[in-house]
Structures are given as C-alpha cells and as structure tokens.
Amino acid sequence: NARWSGPDANGLEWLSRDPAVWDAFRADPLTTEVPLLKLFGPVEALRLYGRPRKHYPRDVPVLLMVGRDDPVGGPRSVHRLADDYRSRSGLTDVTTLVYPEARHEIFHELQQDEVRADLLAWLDTHVPPRG
C-alpha cells in the first residue's frame, strides 16, 4: 500500500479507486488481515501461488483479467501465469486483459462496466450456447 500512503490513507487503497469498495471491505465480516500463508498453511498457499498443472486439455480456453495497478499480482504476474499455461500446460487459447488504473477488485472498480462487458464478450466467443 506504499504507493497510496499519506496522511489521509486508510490502508485499503490497494483494493479499488472507489471509496465505497473500501467501506464494504471494512464492513464485511468475512474479511481477514491474516496472510494467506498463515491462513491456509504452506501446502494450500503453494497451490494458490504455484504454477499451473501440466497436461490440461489443450483446447481449454483461459481468460486472465487484472488491474494494471493491482499490487497483489498485477500484469507481470498475470503475463507470467499466461506464459506458464501456454508452455507448461500446453494451452493454446490464453487471453490476458489488463485494465489501466484498475487495482485489485476489477469487478468493483470505476470501470467495472467495461470489465464486465469484456468478460461477457469473451464468454460469448469461447463458450458455446446450451441447448
């Protein structure tokens, strides 16, 4: 959160540019400040942070979406994950979308309409209709 530190900082600026998201986060009884390693233990945390498995079906489409200013993962991590899906898992259809100025909660960001529209458009082109 150093990027947004200052006398008026509340410690939640990393989530979103929308102050309503900070208020909702603070009010959520399921929110925790416990680090993931401590919360889940080393084995489960490694699964969250680890590399993707090998030998997925090659035609499984993957969409990775991230805010450019997300201090948790950010574009660098997402591009690395996309590369791992291609090289390690053998996937052939991996799409990454990076949202300028967006932070961690891209679906609760100021440009959430764009984020949702991109997701729906991607689903329309990658998931066949039922029935």
Language-model segment annotations:
Residues T31, P35-K54:
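Active-site nucleophile elbow and catalytic-triad environment of alpha/beta-hydrolase enzymes
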Residues P71-R80:
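Conserved alpha/beta-hydrolase "acid-adjacent" motif
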Residues K54-R58, S87-G90:
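Short, conserved loop/helix-junction motifs that constitute active-site signature segments
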Residues R88-G131:
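Catalytic active-site module of serine/aspartate enzymes centered on a nucleophile-bearing elbow/loop
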Residues R51-P57, P128-R130:
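Surface-exposed acidic, glycine-flexible loop patches that form ligand/cofactor-binding
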Residues L81-D84, V115:
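A general structural detector for well-ordered alpha-helical segments in enzyme core domains, enriched
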Residues N1-P35:
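Alpha/beta-hydrolase-fold enzymes
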